[in-house]
């Protein structure tokens, strides 16, 4: 049987759902091909969305009218704004999610999406002619003719689960790996690498001694991810907190030779910033304990996810070390922890549109590009889906730049630097993080979504309303002001320079907020609370944004500057140990070469530039 679609998306995970929905919103007749319809939207690992850097990505996906933010709001059961006490530029919205509710909500929005059809099958082959995608071959000798394909295969490409010395070919527990597709990719000339990730054992919450634990509560005022979410409806839960002990560490040390990671059985490299418990014990042996968060997986589910205990040790060793952790002595293991290896493509094979250079019309998104995390996958999926629809219709492809979005930062990092380990997003990766905040994602990207034709009428109307309210509030505060003497009478300390300062200017002062200004100008009480928060943040950062842009420009001008052979990177203050090691190994000759080192940040590059200049001054004075 032969089907015909404009775009085919392979895989129904976080990248696949976003890619399929985005292509369909762009007007392409789209097929989402998945081995099992009931696993669309499954959270394979941790039951959480967002976090530092990751929460910004979710907001950006939502600003492009993507799905993840709305679905997380519908399924969230413990909302927390991380770094709440710090500045808005580094705050990260996060929620624990009910696995069942998340899957159900994602499947609902996929089924309701116009131009989108779900096909239950396995893709075995990619059809190409003259370097361009033409079709995909399915199980059962069917094929789908198409103009563009988006591969979002997650951990399924030749996936191999490791539990101790046991190996199980699978893409996820009890789900088969995809084997034919890897061979088809290699036949097309793609060189595949191996990466690895892991997951902890799942525990029965009814067998945990909760009275022995610390607790972490949800925020009292949960902040939704999506502009379209009015409020959070689900009850909010509490998570337990415990720690490993010296006995835990002893058992793990004694059994390292049985770990799939440390026995040499695993080829793939794992995510540095989500280490296994074996890695923690080996690399941080001086510590007497590591914190573990016990995260309930649902409102009516007894399963608990022990965040921080990812492992590939044998089941009997997992049982043994769990008994040494406070509160878990009698915990029943529902599913053992495991590591999983899978194939990936060097992302330097891609254009910034996420189309492969080798095969036109073929797009890649998610873990196949060497990233880790639901949020990173979803963000790539949106862009790949929009661009696949563009290729199918003969339109120009699009991509946010590093100055526009964390999505742009991530894609630029991937296609220019490649990966040596699974890539995850951090706020430190962005040069312009003061302007790439979670709270202004709509302002930055929804106009692009409207321009690209992927924003719904509901999204457009809500966005225009919010922007008009912010504009009105800005005008209202800029039209009211105080002289230094008037400010002093209201208890506001400013320089006695005779300059009149508007209410908007006063909001940039650390001790001034809109509530304090309402006492002076009661009419400011007409500004909605959400708008007040946006206005305060905008005013507070305005004075710093110009400086940030100037710093970035200075680094760009200096990219060709040579790095002296004798520079001691270990003596450069502020550099992380990770970067010091990579700099010693690579010995870059110029700042431009240093910039391409995986993990290099704009701030670190500026520190190296300062060290070079200081060395030049010392040599000049000698």
Swiss-Prot record:
Any single Pfam family the record assigns to this protein: GIDA_C_1st
GO molecular function, one term: flavin adenine dinucleotide binding
Annotated GO biological process: tRNA methylation; tRNA wobble uridine modification
Any one Gene Ontology cellular component term annotated for this protein: cytosol
Stored PROSITE patterns: GIDA_1 (PS01280), GIDA_2 (PS01281)
Range of residues in the leader sequence: none
NCBIfam families (alphabetical): mnmG_gidA (TIGR00136)
Protein name: tRNA uridine 5-carboxymethylaminomethyl modification enzyme MnmG
Upper lineage: Bacteria, Pseudomonadati, Pseudomonadota, Alphaproteobacteria, Hyphomicrobiales
């Amino acid at each position: 049987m032969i089907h015909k679609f404009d775009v085919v998306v392979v895989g129904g995970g976080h990248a696949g759902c976003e890619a399929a929905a985005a292509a369909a919103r762009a007007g392409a007749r789209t097929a989402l091909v998945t081995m099992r319809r009931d696993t669309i939207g499954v959270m394979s690992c941790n039951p959480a969305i967002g976090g530092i850097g990751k929460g910004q990505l979710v907001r950006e996906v939502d600003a492009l009218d993507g799905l993840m933010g709305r679905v997380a709001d519908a399924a969230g059961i413990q909302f927390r704004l991380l770094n709440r006490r710090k500045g808005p530029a580094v705050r990260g919205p996060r929620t624990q999610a009910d696995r069942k509710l998340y899957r159900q909500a994602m499947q609902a929005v996929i089924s309701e999406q116009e131009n989108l059809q779900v096909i239950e099958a396995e893709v075995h082959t990619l059809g190409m002619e003259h370097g361009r995608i033409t079709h995909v071959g399915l199980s059962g000798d069917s094929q789908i003719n198409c103009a563009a394909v988006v591969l979002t295969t997650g951990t399924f490409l030749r996936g191999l689960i490791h539990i101790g010395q046991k190996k199980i070919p699978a893409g996820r527990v009890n789900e088969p790996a995809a084997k034919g597709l890897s061979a088809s990719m290699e036949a097309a000339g793609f060189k595949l690498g191996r990466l690895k990730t892991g997951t902890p054992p799942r525990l029965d919450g009814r067998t945990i001694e909760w009275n022995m634990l610390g607790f972490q509560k949800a925020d009292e005022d949960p902040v939704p991810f999506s502009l379209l979410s009015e409020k959070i409806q689900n009850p909010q839960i509490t998570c337990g907190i415990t720690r490993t002990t010296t006995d835990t560490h002893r058992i793990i040390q004694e059994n390292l030779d049985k770990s799939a990671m440390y026995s040499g059985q695993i080829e793939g490299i794992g995510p540095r910033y989500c280490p296994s418990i074996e890695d923690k014990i080996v690399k941080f042996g001086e510590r007497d304990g590591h914190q573990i968060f016990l995260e309930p997986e649902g409102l009516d589910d007894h399963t608990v996810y022990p965040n921080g205990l990812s492992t590939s040790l044998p089941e009997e060793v997992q049982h043994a070390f769990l008994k040494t952790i406070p509160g878990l002595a009698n915990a029943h293991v529902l599913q053992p922890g495991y590591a999983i290896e899978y194939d990936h493509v060097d992302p330097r094979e891609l254009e910034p549109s996420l189309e492969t250079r080798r095969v036109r019309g073929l797009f890649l998104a998610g873990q196949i590009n060497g990233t880790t995390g639901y949020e990173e996958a979803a963000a790539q999926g949106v862009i790949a889906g929009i661009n696949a629809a563009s290729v199918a219709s003969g339109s120009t492809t699009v991509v946010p730049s590093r100055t526009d979005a964390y999505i742009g930062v991530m894609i630029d990092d991937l296609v220019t630097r490649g990966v040596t380990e699974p890539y995850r997003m951090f706020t430190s990766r962005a040069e312009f993080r003061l302007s790439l905040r979670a709270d202004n994602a709509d302002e930055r990207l929804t106009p692009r979504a409207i321009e690209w034709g992927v924003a719904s009428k509901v999204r457009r109307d809500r966005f225009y309303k919010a922007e008009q309210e912010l504009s009105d509030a800005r005008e209202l505060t800029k039209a009211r002001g105080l002289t230094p003497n008037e400010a002093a009478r209201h208890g506001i300390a400013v320089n006695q320079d005779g300059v009149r300062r508007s209410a908007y200017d006063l909001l940039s002062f650390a001790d001034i907020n809109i509530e304090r200004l309402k006492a002076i100008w009661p009419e400011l009480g007409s500004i909605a609370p959400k708008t007040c928060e946006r206005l305060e943040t905008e005013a507070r950062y305005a004075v710093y944004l110009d400086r940030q842009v100037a710093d970035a420009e200075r680094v760009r001008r200096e990219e060709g500057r040579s790095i002296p052979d004798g520079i001691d990177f270990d003596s450069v203050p502020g550099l992380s140990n990770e970067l010091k090691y990579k700099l010693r190994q690579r010995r870059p000759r110029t700042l431009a070469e240093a910039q391409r080192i995986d993990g290099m940040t704009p701030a670190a590059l500026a520190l190296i530039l300062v060290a070079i200049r200081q060395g030049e001054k010392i040599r000049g004075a000698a």
